[in-house]
Each structure stands twice: as C-alpha cells, then as structure tokens.
C-alpha cells in the first residue's frame, strides 16, 4: 500500500474523514467522565469497563508500533510483547516503591531481602522511571536490531529470533532472584504521583493519558508515512535489493523504525500497568506477541488505523469469550487468523478500497503507441566521448566459483568511456555473474577490478559502488510496486540517502525537473501517479531504466532490458540506448539478436565463464568458435 488508509481517506473524502475522526475523539474524551455518574444513571460506566477500554487503547498503541515495522518495513516481529512488558515493569518498580514508602517492596520482604538491588536505585522517582521506560526497551531493541540487521537476518529467521528473545526474557523474569517479583510479578499498587491509583479521578487521568499516547502514535505514524522515510521503508519491504542498488543502506532505516516501535510499546506498557493493577512475566509470553500480529493482520498491514481497529475487535471479542466461553477463546483466535489469511489477506480495512474493474485497469494501462510519439530529447555528446576510449571499467583475470563450479574463469574485459558494449552468450555463460561481480553482490576469488581509473571494486560493497556511479538493471524488472512511478524515481535520485535526509529532505525544483524530464524520455509522463505494480511489463522495464538514469551513473549495467517488450517498445529502447551512449557507458546483456543488431557498438561473447570472442557483431557472427557454441557443431 502506497499510503496508510487514514491518508487515503483524508484525500478522497476530507470532510467525512474529519467528521468521523472528531466524533470518535470526542466520544473517547467524554467516555471516562461517565464513570463519575451515579451507578444507576443510564449513561454511567463501571470502573471495570473504563479499565477494559483503557487496556484496549494500550494494545492499540502496540498494534501501531508493530504496523510500523511489519506493515511498512516488512519485519514481522513476534517479540513486541517483551518491550511492552519492560515498559510495564519499569512503571511497576516506581509503583512498588511508592507503595512501600521507605521500606522494601512486599515481595522482597517476603523473600527476606535486606536491601534493594542496585538497579532499583532511583526507581522511587517518577522522572527516573520515565527514563527507564524509554531507555531500557529502546537500548535493548537498538542492540538486538544492530546485530540482526548487520548480519542481514530477515524473513522467518528474524521472526524466530524475536520470539526467542521474548521467551528468554519471560524465563528470566520468572526467577525470584532477579528482583522482579518472580511468577507473581508486581501488584498491590496504592499511589501514583501522590494520588490513589484506585481513585476514579486517577483512572480517568490514566485513560486520557493513554488516549493522548494513541493519538500521538497515530500522528507520528502518519507523519512518517508522508515523508520520504516512509517511502524508503515501503521500498525495504518490497524490494530491498533494488533499494541497495539505488545507494541506500537499509540497516539504518530498519534500526530507526525498529527502535522507535519498541519505545512506543514500552510507553503503552507503562500506562497499562497502573490501569490493570498488575504486571508479571506472562505479559512476555510469545502468545501475546503473536496476538499482536493477528491484530495487525486483521486490520490491515500498512494502514495504521486498521491495526487499531483490529486490536479493538480482537480484544473486545477476547473479553466476551473469556467470560462466556473461556475454553473456546484460543480456537476462536485461530479461526480469525485462518479466515483473515484465506479471505482478507490485506486485512479487513483494506477491503474498503474497491478494486478496479478489468475495463478500468486495462484503460489505465494503455498508453499512446510508442511509434506515434516524438523521441525524447536526450542531451549527449556521443562522438566526443566515443573518441576518448579510455576504459571506465577494467577487469583482469576474474575468477568466481560456487562449490567447485567455475562461473567465471580468468575473465578479462575493458569497457571504454561512452561505449555501448553488448554481452551475449548461451545460458550459463556467466553473464549475470559478471554483473554480480561488478556491483559487489558477488566477490571474486581472484582478479582485479578497477572502475573510473581509481576505484577498486573488489574492496567496495553494493551501496558504495552505486554511489560511485554504477547503476544496474535486473533481468526481471524490479521496481517498488507499492509506490507511484514518480516516487520510484524520487527514491532513486542521486542525493543524500541517510535516515535524517529522508526524514527532513524535500524535493527542490531542480530534482522535480529531472524527474519530469526522465518521465518524458521514458514516455511515462501520463502515468506519473500510477502505482508501479499496475504498470505493464514493458512499462516496468522503462521505469527501472529511468531509476538508473536519475542516479546519473557513469556506467549502466542492463540485464535483458528488452525482454518481454512489444516490438514498438523494443525499437524505442534501442533508440534510447543509442542516444544514451556517449554520455554514459552501457553494458547490455541480451539474448534478442535483432535488438543487438540495432545497438551493437562492440560485442563480447561469453562461454563457460570466459571471453570467447570480441569485436563487431559481424566479426563475432563469423567466428568459428562462436558458431560452434551456438549451433553445436
């Protein structure tokens, strides 16, 4: 999803969205004050009901936090219950000190402890408790995320590690000697900031504080989604490799949102504890973290408001089931998960977005016949560059093997400045491996690689190589399908690609002009706001080429750029490459010999990881070794 549902609704129906939001907010603000009414008043609510709704609001904050990492960054955490519980324990320490006064907490006296553990120091102060609420879960999340993302752990392995982390925390807190109350945890709270915890006025204040946290969390999520940072997270989820080849380091973005998410959970846990009156290790149970994932899945990932509703629906149903039919709750929860997976894979809220009809979709994907349009104006100096012939890329004796299979054997190759080099060869010749080596995806065992006369590619990673000026297009067009055409080009542009820049930076007029010019060159101007996933195959090919062009690279590596294109699209692609050659150096891997004939400047034939022949297309076509390889004689 390109934008969260709340943003989409605001754009499509601003008045309706505003009214709905205001009515809901007013209702939640008024709700706790109904607890002050006499018990026999028809509008009065009980303290139990107020506590239940406050607890659900805390869970809603957790759902938003999980949606930020799972719905946007694609990181399924099964351990957010740990951060929630740590925030609760930090608040519980403060409440236990308030209840004990100058003495030891009750559980410590029961265990015959004579003094407070060192880590309880200062816990009687509310400000220090707030610091613990934020710093302890935040630091743990940062350290865990740093090593996990640095090790490139992702997918199911990341989920398993988060589940193991929360399970380890639960086992640790179950032990009496750790100083956290063991199996019973913390309870018996009496005072908070000088007010009785059980007083109705205190519960109203806690409810309103929870509501403020929920609104702030939702507003923060919306703000992030509107920034370039939110679009980068979406790109991490949908095509992390493409993002790296655009020059971004995903680790920093994932670490930032992961730590932020943990802190939000901790704040929710801190407000949860004084409302329910207890915190124990069961809050760290992996089951609770899995339930949180169900809230997000039910409401709709990447929608922000959906997980809030999902948390409300599931926990409202849980409260009813655990009283009416407690033995069936787990079965009901499993049924919800199965139904959502089978019938609502995008979540219940996402169903509110009506899919386009086949006619509408077809109509939107059709664009003017390419041959009927004038070629895009591309400024270049082909003759000037082609006369230089200084090598932009030099490979010497490159060897790559995988488990004894030699993908590249003593391969040597030079690409000149402004040259358009075509690489051909049968399947398995090493063409894609060659591109992997040049872009840092695969490290050669031996050999020398020099780019632009002074860059040693063998010591650089993919991100550094992208910043140095090498752009790569993959065999299968790889774009950020949840983002618009314009946003794909925006992310790929050559500029600062740090977390801070993505949070604060905005496009200037020069950058917008570059995107507009690129869209015109690619014949995609009319589709600038189209979601990239709705483009035709050929249009995706053009978009990916455009993502390379806005990076302003010196060397473009293009892997089967004409594959799957129509004849008209193929013809225009050939024209485009001929115009680009000179301003850029191009290395094109392609099987379509008709396409090769229209662009061939110099052709290299690979076979079994070695250079078999080089020269003009006519020369390699007459080469006996090439004929033998292609025709088998």
PLM regions and their residue ranges:
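ABC ATPase NBD Q-loop/coupling interface
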Residues: 448-467, 505-507
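Transmembrane alpha-helices and adjacent helix-loop boundaries
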Residues: 2-375
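The feature captures the beta-strand-to-loop junction immediately N-terminal to the Walker
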Residues: 424-426
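A short, surface-exposed alpha-helical micro-motif characterized by mixed small hydrophobic
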Residues: 596-598
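Helix-to-loop junction immediately C-terminal to a conserved catalytic motif
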Residues: 439
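Catalytic Walker B motif of ABC-type/P-loop ATPase nucleotide-binding domains
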Residues: 556-560
């Amino acid at each position: 999803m390109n934008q969260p549902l709340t943003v989409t609704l605001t754009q499509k129906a601003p008045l309706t969205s505003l009214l709905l939001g205001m009515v809901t907010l007013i209702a939640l603000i008024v709700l706790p004050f109904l607890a002050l009414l006499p018990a026999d008043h028809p509008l009065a609510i009980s303290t139990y009901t107020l506590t239940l709704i406050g607890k659900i609001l805390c869970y809603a904050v957790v759902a938003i936090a999980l949606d930020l990492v799972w719905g946007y960054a694609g990181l399924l955490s099964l351990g957010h219950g740990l951060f929630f519980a740590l925030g609760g324990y930090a608040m519980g320490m403060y409440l236990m000190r308030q209840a004990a006064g100058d003495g030891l907490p009750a559980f410590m006296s029961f265990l015959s402890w004579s003094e407070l553990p060192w880590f309880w120091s200062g816990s009687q102060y509310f400000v220090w408790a707030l610091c613990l609420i934020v710093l302890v879960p935040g630091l743990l999340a940062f350290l865990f995320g740093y090593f996990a993302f640095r090790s490139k752990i992702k997918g199911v392995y990341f989920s398993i590690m988060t589940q193991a982390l929360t399970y380890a925390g639960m086992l640790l807190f179950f032990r009496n000697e750790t100083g956290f109350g063991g199996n019973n945890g913390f309870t018996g709270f009496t005072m908070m900031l000088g007010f009785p915890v059980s007083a109705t006025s205190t519960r109203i204040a806690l409810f309103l504080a929870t509501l403020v946290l929920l609104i702030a969390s939702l507003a923060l999520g919306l703000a992030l989604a509107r920034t370039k940072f939110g679009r980068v997270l979406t790109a991490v989820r949908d095509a992390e490799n493409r993002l790296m080849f655009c020059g971004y380091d995903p680790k920093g973005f994932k670490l930032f949102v992961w730590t932020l998410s943990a802190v939000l959970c901790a704040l929710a846990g801190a407000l949860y504890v004084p409302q329910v009156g207890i915190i124990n290790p069961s809050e760290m149970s992996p089951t609770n973290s899995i339930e949180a994932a169900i809230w997000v899945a039910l409401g709709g990932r990447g929608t922000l408001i959906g997980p809030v509703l999902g948390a409300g629906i599931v926990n409202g149903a849980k409260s009813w089931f655990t009283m009416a039919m407690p033995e069936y709750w787990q079965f009901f929860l499993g049924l919800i998960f199965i139904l959502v997976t089978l019938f609502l894979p995008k979540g219940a809220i996402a169903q509110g977005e009506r899919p386009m009809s086949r006619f509408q979709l077809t109509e939107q994907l059709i664009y003017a016949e390419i041959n009927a349009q004038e070629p895009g104006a591309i400024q270049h100096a082909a003759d000037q560059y082609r006369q230089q012939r200084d090598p932009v890329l030099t490979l010497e004796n490159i060897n790559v093997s995988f488990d004894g299979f030699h993908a590249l054997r003593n391969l040597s190759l030079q690409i000149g400045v402004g040259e358009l080099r075509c690489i051909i060869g049968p399947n398995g010749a090493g063409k894609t491996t060659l591109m992997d080596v040049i872009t840092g995806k695969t490290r050669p065992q031996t050999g020398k690689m020099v780019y632009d006369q002074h860059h040693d590619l063998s010591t650089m990673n993919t991100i550094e190589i992208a910043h140095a000026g090498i752009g790569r297009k993959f065999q299968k067009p790889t774009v950020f399908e949840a983002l618009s055409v314009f946003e794909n080009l925006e992310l790929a542009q050559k500029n600062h690609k740090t977390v801070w820049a993505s949070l604060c930076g905005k496009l200037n007029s020069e950058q917008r002009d570059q995107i507009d010019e690129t869209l015109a060159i690619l014949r995609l101007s009319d589709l600038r706001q189209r979601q990239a996933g709705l483009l035709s195959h050929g249009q995706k090919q053009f978009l990916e080429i455009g993502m390379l062009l806005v990076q302003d690279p010196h060397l473009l590596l293009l892997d089967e750029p004409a594959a799957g294109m129509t004849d008209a699209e193929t013809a225009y692609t050939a024209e485009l490459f001929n115009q680009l050659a000179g301003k850029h150096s191009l290395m094109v891997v392609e099987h379509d010999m008709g396409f090769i004939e229209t662009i061939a400047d110099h052709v290299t034939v690979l076979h079994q990881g070695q250079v078999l022949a080089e020269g003009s297309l006519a020369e390699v076509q007459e080469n006996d070794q090439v004929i033998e390889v292609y025709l088998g004689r």
